[in-house]
Amino acid sequence: MTKRWLTKENSIKYLNEAFYGHLATVSNNQPYLVPVNYVYQQNHLYIHSALQGQKIANIRENSRICFEISHPIQLLLGEKPCQFGMHYWSVLVFGQAHILDDFNLKTAALKLFIEKYSHKDNLSPMDPNDIENVAIIDITIENISGKANY
């Protein structure tokens, strides 16, 4: 087993490949962790959300976030309890989050979600009311690191 730090490029590669991650926010010194769908583009993560809720309230109070993705590859069984292990990769992101208010920026971010998650070429156009009724969290990445154990 070789543990190694991933390059920034490999960490970004995994960010582009993973389908969901875990967003950590804080309010009143209480951490809050939630699974989310996201897209990555040019040192930003975009997260689709309801307009209200704990994660939105936390971001409005404290914009500092941590975001995590990971993938187990293989469980390694040993003869003794301390010989067990796991082949995996993981990526951590630290940054500042804010809620997009601009209609055009929200639309552009939602198009990134469609590109990543939809396999249909003939989707109907986005309804402006739907765009207004969704929150897009924009995370500016300040630090990204990844680790793998293959």
Located regions from the model:
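Short Pro/Gly-enriched beta-strand edge/turn motifs at strand-loop
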Residues: W5, E17-Y20, H119-N122
